[in-house]
Design a protein with these regions (language model features):
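Short alpha-helical segments that sit at the start of domains
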Residues: 1-16, 21, 65
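A short, conserved structural fragment
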Residues: 53-61
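Short, hydrophobic-biased segments on the C-terminal half of alpha helices
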Residues: 46-50
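Key DNA-contact positions within bacterial/archaeal DNA-binding proteins
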Residues: 43
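Short acidic, hydrophobic short linear motifs in intrinsically disordered regions
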Residues: 24-34
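Short, basic interhelical loop/turn and adjoining N-cap
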Residues: 36-40
Length: 134
């Protein structure tokens, strides 16, 4: 886990933008929002995102090709994170549980499968949007 104080200027700009965003952002949306801070090319954003994802500060949401800041900024030790993504408002809720991690790790090992990556994303409608629709 990298400490926040070792992040580069670009990495810190991207992280701060994600931390203050009201929902997930794509790399190109980040680029548009960071142009005023000197960002000119998609590669600047992608490099920063790559490091932030690897160090646990940011999560990539595979199903919507977007990024969110980690909801647990002081605990990047979780290996398995699940997300609930609202298709109506875009709200993302993050959940990690060491017991779930352990059970999934045991299951994968018992099958002899060599997992490289795991992504758990639930798509649907959040409680607030469901209540508003009722």
């Amino acid at each position: 886990m990298a400490a926040r104080d070792v992040l580069t200027k670009n990495q810190l700009c991207v992280l701060e933008k994600l931390e203050t965003a009201s929902g997930p952002l794509s790399a190109y949306t980040l680029l548009d929002q960071l142009r005023e801070r000197g960002f000119r090319a998609p590669l600047q954003v992608y490099r920063a995102l790559d490091t932030l994802v690897k160090s646990g500060f940011v999560h990539r949401l595979e199903s919507i090709n977007s990024f969110v800041a980690c909801a647990e900024p002081h605990d990047h030790s979780h290996s398995m994170t699940a997300f609930a993504i609202c298709d109506s408002c875009g709200q993302v809720t993050e959940m990690s549980d060491h017991d779930v991690d352990h059970r999934l790790d045991e299951w994968v090992r018992s099958t002899g499968f060599a997992a490289k990556k795991a992504v758990i994303e639930f798509r649907g409608v959040c409680a607030k949007c469901r209540a508003e629709a009722a």
